[in-house]
């Protein structure tokens, strides 16, 4: 006899938060809040959550208090889909983000994009659809 799969609750997720772990929390606060200018939506003291889009958030966490530690290998990429990648590239070049790539296109992925690193070494990709 086959068991019936449980039904997903009707109350959908309100936010998707990606948590990244910082050795120096203030650097993350300055970068996401001041340099990139994202609004802080939730301040939990040792974790600051920034609104990146309507339901997408980045949580910057003090590694000494969070569930994980910062690690030299950063297998997470923060990706923002924007309507005008050229305008965002100009802005990032003007503010001097670390390891700013050239703009590139991928016909396979149907994107125009560039990448840079945040102060903790996480890669941030800014992309625009080209279809």
Regions found by a protein language model. Give the residues of each.
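Conserved active-site alpha-helix within GNAT-family acetyltransferase domains
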Residues: 26-35, 114
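A cross-family glycoside hydrolase active-site/sugar-binding cleft signature
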Residues: 19, 61, 79, 102, ...
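N-terminal beta-strand motif that seeds the catalytic metal site of vicinal oxygen chelate
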Residues: 1-29, 76-78, 130-131
């Amino acid at each position: 006899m086959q068991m019936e799969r449980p039904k997903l609750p009707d109350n959908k997720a309100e936010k998707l938060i990606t948590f990244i772990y910082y050795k120096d929390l203030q650097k993350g606060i300055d970068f996401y809040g001041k340099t990139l200018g994202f609004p802080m939506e939730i301040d939990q003291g040792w974790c600051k959550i920034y609104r990146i889009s309507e339901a997408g958030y980045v949580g910057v966490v003090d590694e000494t208090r969070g569930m994980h530690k910062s690690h030299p290998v950063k297998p997470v990429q923060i990706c923002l889909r924007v309507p005008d990648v050229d305008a965002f590239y100009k802005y990032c070049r003007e503010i001097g983000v670390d390891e700013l790539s050239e703009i590139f296109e991928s016909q396979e992925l149907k994107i125009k994009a560039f990448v840079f690193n945040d102060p903790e070494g996480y890669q941030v990709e800014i992309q625009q659809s080209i279809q």
